[in-house]
C-alpha cells in the first residue's frame, strides 16, 4: 500500500498531507544540495514535475534501473492495482457520528495492522505487504455518520471487537477544525 500511495502522489492524486510532506522534504533536499536557491523555487519545481508527469516518469525509470521489466514498470505507474499484491479482504470502517474529522488515533490503527501482519512482534515475524489502511478522509473534513472513513486491507477475518476498535479510532468535532501545515519547524 505504501507503493500505491507513493504512485498516487506522483500522479497528483495523493492525499494532501502526504503530498505536502513529500514536497517539503524534497524542497529541503533541493535547497541543501544547491539544485534550488530557495524553498519556494524548489516547491515550484517539484509541483511542476508532479503536474507534468516528469516525477512519475522518473519513478518508472528508477524501477527499470533496479531490474523491473519495462512493461511491468509501465503498468505499475499507469495501473498499479494490476501489478501490486492485494489482500483477500477490504473492510470499510464508517464514522459513528457526524462532524469534522479532528483526530485519528494512529496507534490504534498500528496495533490492529500489526496483528494482521503489517508489522512485527519479533524480529523473526514476516511482514505482509498487502495489509494496511487507506484513510479516505482528511483532518478538518466534514463526515456524516455511516460514511466510510477508512478501508482496511487484510487477509484474516476481522473480529467484531477489532471493527469496534477501528471505528473508535476516529474522533469528530461539532466545530470546524483549523488545519495547520504538518511542518512545525525546520531543525538545522
Stretches found by the model and what they are:
Residues 1-188:
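Well-ordered secondary-structure scaffolds
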Amino acid at each position: 500500500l505504501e507503493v500505491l500511495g507513493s504512485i498516487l502522489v506522483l500522479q497528483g492524486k495523493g492525499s494532501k498531507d502526504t503530498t505536502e510532506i513529500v514536497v517539503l522534504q524534497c524542497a529541503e533536499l533541493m535547497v541543501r544540495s544547491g539544485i534550488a536557491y530557495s524553498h519556494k523555487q524548489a516547491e515550484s519545481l517539484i509541483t511542476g514535475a508532479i503536474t507534468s508527469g516528469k516525477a512519475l516518469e522518473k519513478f518508472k525509470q528508477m524501477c527499470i534501473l533496479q531490474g523491473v521489466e519495462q512493461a511491468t514498470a509501465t503498468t505499475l505507474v499507469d495501473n498499479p492495482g494490476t501489478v501490486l499484491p492485494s489482500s483477500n479482504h477490504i473492510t470499510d470502517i464508517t464514522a459513528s457520528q457526524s462532524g469534522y474529522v479532528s483526530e485519528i488515533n494512529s496507534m490504534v490503527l498500528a496495533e490492529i495492522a500489526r496483528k494482521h501482519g503489517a508489522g512485527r512482534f519479533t524480529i523473526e515475524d514476516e511482514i505482509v505487504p498487502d495489509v494496511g489502511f487507506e484513510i479516505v478522509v482528511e483532518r478538518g473534513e466534514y463526515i456524516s455518520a455511516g460514511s466510510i472513513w477508512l478501508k482496511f486491507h487484510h487477509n484474516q477475518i476481522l473480529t467484531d471487537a477489532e471493527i469496534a476498535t477501528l471505528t473508535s479510532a476516529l474522533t469528530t468535532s461539532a466545530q470546524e477544525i483549523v488545519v495547520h501545515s504538518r511542518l512545525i519547524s525546520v531543525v538545522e
